[in-house]
């Protein structure tokens, strides 16, 4: 016996059999030990051969059990194992059989045949008793081998290669496991057209991720099964190659190539009956490539060129360009079929086709309006992915979310159960009390508990009944789906009696039962049963960060009160607030180009008048969040080269992988206000980047990705022309100096930049009467800082006037007021809090003195008998 002549699998089995013999206490190594490990193998090649040869694996196991128990056992001896005479003959016969068949190595099936043929071995009797004959085994082996010989030590891994390394899509289609494919007729027709060619009949589906390339292959499988293909493709098998399984576990050099050759050999032997589908086709290029080895694509090329291999590939545009086009010899063997993203209307049709599958899986209903919302909202708000994939994901997640709520206890019932638990704890505590009040309270608790437990039982029964009803509807849908699949199979097989029973008996009956189950509407139902546009919008909100009420709240009321809302934060700039509100209303009413940003504005005015504050207020109004804003200080972009910081460095430069400040912020959160502060400080070339943002709502970053700006509000602030606005009289209209200001602006910015901005808004200097309102806003912010300490500030009218007068400076706007409040209010307050004069929870009255403010705590450690000290500290 030469162990080198045996395959790795057989060597492994011999080793396992020896270990098994020793652990069983046997000193003789017999054929029974070998058969035992062969039959118990996880991959089951021997067991599969026995079954295919007409044998009974269970009988083989029972016979082996009996034979092994009869073998002599030795305990406490040495670990010496002796080869029995029958086993030596089995090995010799196996080598002889392999040699006759032209094999270079002894394989599992040759060893199994030898175990069945060698009369001196007990295994021959066991296999014979189980119905296995050497003749039947040889027939099955020849069927499996398909004329191939075992030329390598890993020969067994190449048997039934297609079954191991590919998935039969046509079989899945027959079993009804594939989702229906709606539309895409043109692409499927083009694919069939290429497949019907004589040579180079290999289409490759090229399109963006998520547009439905794999679905087209599944659509082709469904058409083949339904016979909806030309004669040349009738009864073909479409097999999806699993590159992961093909590469996994290929440890030794040349093993991967062997597996792939085995797959190709099976496809070629099928004489054109098998079409291979390779998803992510770019993985072929370089797959299995090691020193001196060929990669998968080179192994495929000859068969592809001769037309022996029918192949459908699928890959994305990016990967096709990066991997396949570089290999011109591979690219020319494939015929590209471009798959475009479907329109919103097509996506709605696709969702309607898939609706039943998702309803059946999640056991909830999906309304048609939810499908329309999923298609339209995903198209509008999820810009970095493609239809129909993103819309399908939305429906899937919305249904999953609803199902989670259905399975959880309803809020109403949960509150009652928590109250019952609370009352039970209180009842146990009161039972030990003897006073009259406690007894009276105990009686009231018993009464309330009785009522609540009754209500809880009713609600629980109602909840369970509703869940059961939902489950019944889902069960009927599943039965209906199975009946439809059975009808399709019966029609294909020509079983017309069965088809008639299903079509005119079972299916109409199930449809009626389902309609009855769904028509029973529950008034005041505890459970939501249907996915609505609201659920879809909530998922969008989770994905993108847009508050859901921004889309679903009646926006008319919200937009009509926009001036009032923003006016609470921005004082004295009525014209600016009105102008920006009108622009946003125009955009929301759909009267503005949807391919441009929501609005783009330049705010011009002196310092401290509220330009940046208006931007923050706008972000808070539109997105309910002050931080939904990217602030870019243009003073940092004074050099020409600094533009790369906005959009990312070009290839070959340091920082290429990092992306740009502007583009990355908008890619991560596409819905926000973008503030370019002090734009006149930036280099003029920086504005060239903004031209396409303002015009088309898009910008290409350093890595070639298109970033969508259609849902942003772009605001630029500047001090240009501020001298004209500062010198304006308190009651003068800003429009009187607009021409002068615009003259300065035009001298600084190019016409094509200014021409793309929606509106240039002028801010006038703050008036004296505006200062009181600004004092209140600033004091509210200070009050917020003190809220942790529960200290309340009460600012008297005289103190407000005092602060407004002291902080008013027409040239510098509201900023001097902030400094005055810091010096006259915050500093004394901080000192008093640290001294312990003002305690947590105090009310502090602030009044005006002659040259300072006075602080009087109403409650706390500060003594009313020490007014002199209070004034000193002020």
UniProtKB/Swiss-Prot annotation:
Q: What is known of its domains?
A: The Clp repeat (R) domain probably functions as a substrate-discriminating domain, recruiting aggregated proteins to the ClpB hexamer and/or stabilizing bound proteins. The NBD2 domain is responsible for oligomerization, whereas the NBD1 domain stabilizes the hexamer probably in an ATP-dependent manner. The movement of the coiled-coil domain is essential for ClpB ability to rescue proteins from an aggregated state, probably by pulling apart large aggregated proteins, which are bound between the coiled-coils motifs of adjacent ClpB subunits in the functional hexamer.
Q: What does this protein do?
A: Part of a stress-induced multi-chaperone system, it is involved in the recovery of the cell from heat-induced damage, in cooperation with DnaK, DnaJ and GrpE. Acts before DnaK, in the processing of protein aggregates. Protein binding stimulates the ATPase activity; ATP hydrolysis unfolds the denatured protein aggregates, which probably helps expose new hydrophobic binding sites on the surface of ClpB-bound aggregates, contributing to the solubilization and refolding of denatured protein aggregates by DnaK.
Taxonomically, what lineage is the organism?
A: Bacteria, Pseudomonadati, Pseudomonadota, Alphaproteobacteria, Hyphomicrobiales
Which stretches does the entry tag as region Repeat 2? 83-147
Name it.
Chaperone protein ClpB
Stretches the record annotates as Repeat 1? 6-71
Q: List the disulfide bonds.
A: none
**Keyword Nucleotide-binding attributed:** yes
- Summary of subunit composition and partner proteins: Homohexamer. The oligomerization is ATP-dependent.
Sorted alphabetically, the Gene Ontology cellular component annotations on this record are: cytoplasm
Q: Which Pfam families match?
A: AAA, AAA_2, AAA_lid_9, Clp_N, ClpB_D2-small
Task: List the SMART domains.
Answer: AAA, ClpB_D2-small
Subcellular location(s) of the protein: Cytoplasm
Query: What broad class describes the main subcellular location of this protein?
Result: cytoplasm
Sorted alphabetically, which Gene3D superfamilies does this protein's record hold? 1.10.8.60, Clp, N-terminal domain, P-loop containing nucleotide triphosphate hydrolases
**Which residues does the record give as ATP 1 binding sites?**
207-214
What GO annotations for molecular function exist for this entry?
Answer: ATP binding; ATP hydrolysis activity
